[in-house]
Amino acid sequence: MSKAYIFPGQGSQFPGMGKALYERSAEARELMDRANEILGFPITDIMFGESAEDLKATRVTQPAIFIHSVVLALCSGLETPAMVAGHSLGEFSALAAAGAMSFEDALKLVAVRASAMQKCCEQVPGSMAAIIKLPTETIEEVCASCSGLVIPANYNSEGQVVISGEAEAVAEACKKMMEAGAKRALPLPVSGAFHSPLMEPARLELAEAIDKTPFQAPACPVYQNVTALPATDPDVIKANLLKQLTSPVRWTQTVQNMVADGADYFLEIGPGTVLQGLVGRIAPDVVKEGLSE
């Protein structure tokens, strides 16, 4: 089997995440304790707690998912895969797990990313919506026809594309999508237009941090969100990562390309099962499993 490891993004967090791993592995404890030091607050107390609400703050959610995913990948005795990818935030987990960045450096970037995105949401409010069961071409055409800024932001699977942009434009697009035959147009509970040009202030802040971060060639190709293509050159990886916050996540094409390049086993590492579901819709014949504790 040709193995692909995939890493989830924001929204997959759950109360108690990582607690069992922390208790059973000295290596995991060391990394998680180090994460608390880097972040300057005991994030593990929030991760291991019982409150889903406490996990929802972006400054907590993104580092928590990253820590859980990467510590699992590094401390579970896994063999090096043929390839890796991550959805949005998960791309940082994939890069750290594959050795393109150190755990510490990647966590610092995730913390900057979370803070910058939170600030951007407050300064440049926007919204997002999931469009269910409408051809991708139609979604792109409808977005282009709207009066404000709205674009496809996450190509999650053939039947699910998330749009992002100015609130009024997203609302207009949702109405037009339903008229065009969408099964549903579901507003998402977010206060920002992630993966759209409205995230430019956050992108600029993150770019400064990325520029100062050392990257090296990963142990295997990393399929990146912006291109859906494999990368091993540190300069290429860095350039694509710089574009990620304001560009669509091409997840459908990423999985299709991984399968075309030989992947027939996908292991989702981290909280939740969202990516297993998406992979199942994109490539029904591959084996899918999850590692979440």
Give a label for each model feature.
Residues 247-263:
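A short, acidic, amphipathic alpha-helical segment used as a generic capping/interface helix at domain edges
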Residues 169-170, 209, 248, 262, ...:
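NAD(P)-dependent dehydrogenase/reductase Rossmann-like domain
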Residues 10-12, 39, 98-246:
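Alpha/beta catalytic cores of group-transfer enzymes, especially the acyltransferase/condensing modules
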Residues 61-63, 193, 248:
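Glycine-rich phosphate/pyrophosphate-binding beta-alpha loops
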Residues 1-139, 184, 188, 265-293:
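FabD-like malonyl-/acyl-CoA
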Residues 77, 178, 259-262:
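Non-catalytic positions within long, well-ordered alpha-helices that form the structural scaffold/packing
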Residues 236, 240, 250-253, 274:
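Short amphipathic alpha-helical segments
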